[in-house]
Amino acid sequence: MSDENENGRPGGRTPMTLKPRQGSVSAGVVKQSFSHGRTKTVVVETKRTRTHAPASGNLAAPSSAERRHGEAPAPRPAPPQGGGGGSAGGLSQEELRARQRVVDAAREAQARQVAEQAAAEARARAAQEAAQREAAAKAAAERAAAAPPPVAQAPAAPAPAAPVTPPPAAPQAPRPVAQAPVAPSAPRQDAPRQDTRAAAPGQTRTYEPSRDRRDDRPSTTTYRPAPQGDRPFNQRAPRPDANANFGQRAPRPEGDRPRGPRPDGDRPQGDRGGYRGDRPQGDRPQGDRPQQTVRYSALAPRPAPGARGPGGPPRGPRPGVPAAAPATPEIQRATRSAPRPGGGAMDRRPDEDDDRRKNAAPNKAVSRVKGAPQRREGRLTIQAVAGDGDSADRMRSLASVRRAREREKEKRRGGAVEQARVAREVVIPDVITVQELSNRMAVRGVDIIKFLMRQGVMLKINDVIDNDTAELVATEFGHTVKRVSEADVEEGFIGADDHDEHMDLRPPVVTIMGHVDHGKTSLLDALRSTDVAAGEAGGITQHIGAYQVRLKDGQRVTFLDTPGHAAFSSMRARGANITDIVVLVVAGDDGVMPQTIEAIKHAKAAEVPIIVAVNKMDKPGSDPTRVVNELLQHEIVVESLGGDTQLIEVSAKARTGLDNLLEAILLQAEVLDLKANPDRSADGVVIEAKLDKGRGAVSTVLVNRGTLKRGDIVVAGSQWGKVRALLNERNEQLQEAGPATPVEILGLDGVPSPGDAFAVVENEARARELTEYRIRLKREKSMAPVGAGASMADMMAKLQDKKLKELPLVIKADVQGSAEAIIGSLDKMATDEVRARIILSGAGAISESDVMLAKGAGAPVIGFNVRASAQARALAEREGVEIRYYAIIYDLLDDIKGVLSGMLAPIQRETFLGNAEVLQAFDISKIGKVAGCKVTEGVVRKGAKVRIIRQDIVVLELGTLQTLKRFKDEVNEVPVGQECGMMFAGFQDIKVGDTIECFTVEEIKRQLD
């Protein structure tokens, strides 16, 4: 019976709970441990019994001693439903008095029935005892024949309860009962019972919980009223005097009754049970009682008191215990309405109980109805707490039960309501993993994978997808997309353009360009009144220099001196890109040269105006007209010919024409209207960089806009640092540098590359972010060619590269620009057969780490305008590493070119001598085959190379003519028309008709172009 069915009834059970009961129930906690490692804490409830005095009027259940002596138990008082304050039994005084009146009426009715029943019982007792003994003996004989068990003393058969009479009387001595051996019974088949409610309408059955535990099983046996009618007299217990009253009966001794040896197997059935109507007469069904599995659930209602269990009949009073007195309708109503002291219903209606027990299958355990919710099974009992394995296995935790209830509620509601998706702005970088995308979208990764699978893309949770695919997924899930890139860190590095109202005039930046040895540096020295050219190695400029000249009128002009050698093409290009005006220096006696043409191309590419300075006009033979005509071939039209290019004749040595040159520069700057904003953060370009032993990384920069100050945080390429010092070209300390000012800055953590842009950033975090991104980008670019080459053409190119000879080199230069120029020149020397492979290049002195790196690669160390430290020199001597020093780039490139030329394979050149034809082949013992030949063309020479041709097929290539004889004499040469004998080294397959071609091979050494 479910909790819902009982809630509306007056005597219905209340829902079970694991909470400790109040009042008469004490609770404790017991911790269970299982073999599989789980532990469980259960609540143990112990009901405290309460004893009541007989004279108080509280008609509680009689004690076990009274029940043993055959007294009819009085109806149990029904406590009030409200549970308010009452007597000790839970009833108010008015209810107790009403209850007492009902009980007194019942006693009077029972007294009247005693006299009528006594005579009938006496007559039927003898016959019934005889029939019972005969049936018991027959059943015992049959069971003993099947499986003889040990014989034990049978318990006394129960007798019907004796009627209680009001007058007191002495208790009657118990009558001895015959004993018979009892064997395990067969499965009991319940005989059909008759409903006796029609015959005895005034009789009802009242259930009382048993207080006497006679075995270890949890008993739910209840007291039932004694059925009317005859019962076998031999099953009665010793009964007291019929005239004895409740208070006059002898008290029943406390404790369990003395037991004899318990018979093995199942006890005989049929001797227990409540009132079931008139029992059919005859032999009792034989067989053992069916074994039934009783399963209790903590969520299901408990069996009603008096119910034996699911699928089994209710138990009646124990043998020898009198049944309760028949109750009147008032007692029936009071009993039904009275709840159990511990909560819950105390009894069930007899008709429903009997019908349910009668229709239940005897061998079928209680199971869950198909489709019904699976509830928690297991019952909190002493057996479960004590370690009963079956009960412990059936127990489930309270949290599990709660989760099951939640699932049941969700099923009844039609399933959990799916949470509405919230549209978000998803930031998507260039590449992103599926896991990261799911986190940003707040969706499950498996949902994204399913969507991609429907699109035909099979991915795992850690796979990387591009931003286009990620945008498609995010849009499909209803989110908005914001695409970002790692390159976004570069945004704002160089500030926006300035407004005109913030602009001020700035000095012009002039780059001196031209061919080598045309007097560029000498001209700049004349303008600066210095002598820089005298201190240069080889009389040539190998570094880009930056100077600022202050004129007589206070104006300033910034000059950049670029090298004129072919190796410094990148420097010239860099100078053209950062300059405002290009001064093209052309020697009057030499004219336009290759580097002059290159400078013109750089200036045109940078869209920079050109001023032509014809130098060396003091030398005889200088012809400016020749220079003008040669410039016309390269689209340079001077003003004298109607063009816009100024041409100035100067002499750096005689210092003539310098003022005209400065005037032309200022005029061109005025036309350009050069302006910049000094009141902003500085940015510019790195002109040159080097590594100084005492000062560290030194970078020469040109400020384009803003003002660079000491203490600013500067990012230049992949290097950053705080400006510790600002130096001009005269090594003077500066506090700040304005627009178009070249300065040297100290404080960077490394040497930047020439041509890198620099700018001042707001903090160190921003500087680190920029440099880390640039370093990562550079590393990815350097590693990119490793994974290339998936096509067949690339694979063939790799196979050819394996035949390529390489010259490993470690190059250290004084400045980064010089190292860059050397590497560029070496790359131009490379051919399909040889090339120079740069292991390391940089600016600074040669260190021990450079020597060890060169030793591992088997490479020499090239020092350009630098020297090795003492420790590095000693290490190089011990390890056998060659160090070469150079001060002029010509010498360095010539030596490397010679080494690469020596690595080229020499050319094999053949010189034809003559042909001969084999006329006869002789096989001579101990010598081998000898060819008898006739020279048909030219001469044949001993020791020359031969090629044997047979039917237009070469059968011997590059053989050697080992022996040449004329008759019996060995000769060195046989001319045309004569016969001779020939023998070849390592070749015996000579046949008549073969053609022998004789020639010489000469090796020619190759040179790089």
Swiss-Prot record:
Any one Gene Ontology cellular component term annotated for this protein: cytosol
Residue ranges of the region described as G5: 651-653
Chain positions covered by the region annotation G2: 539-543
Region ranges (G4): 615-618
Segments of skewed composition (Basic and acidic residues): 94-110, 122-136, 208-218, 251-287, 346-358, 403-415
Compositionally skewed regions (Pro residues) per UniProt: 147-174, 311-320
Annotated region described as G1, given as residue ranges: 514-521
Entries under InterPro entries matching the protein: EF-G-like_DII, EFTu-like_2, IF2_assoc_dom_bac, IF2_II, IF2_N, P-loop_NTPase, Small_GTP-bd, T_Tr_GTP-bd_dom
Region (G3): 561-564
Localization terms from the record: Cytoplasm
Molecular function terms, GO-annotated: GTP binding; GTPase activity; guanosine tetraphosphate binding; translation initiation factor activity
Annotated tr-type G domain residues: 505-675
Binding residues for GTP: 514-521, 561-565, 615-618
Chain residue ranges for the region called Disordered: 1-415
Gene3D superfamilies: P-loop containing nucleotide triphosphate hydrolases, Translation factors, Translation initiation factor IF- 2, domain 3
HAMAP family noted in UniProt: IF_2_B (MF_00100_B)
Annotated function: One of the essential components for the initiation of protein synthesis. Protects formylmethionyl-tRNA from spontaneous hydrolysis and promotes its binding to the 30S ribosomal subunits. Also involved in the hydrolysis of GTP during the formation of the 70S ribosomal complex.
PANTHER family (UniProt xref): TR-TYPE G DOMAIN-CONTAINING PROTEIN, TRANSLATION INITIATION FACTOR IF-2-RELATED
Similarity section: Belongs to the TRAFAC class translation factor GTPase superfamily. Classic translation factor GTPase family. IF-2 subfamily.
Protein name: Translation initiation factor IF-2
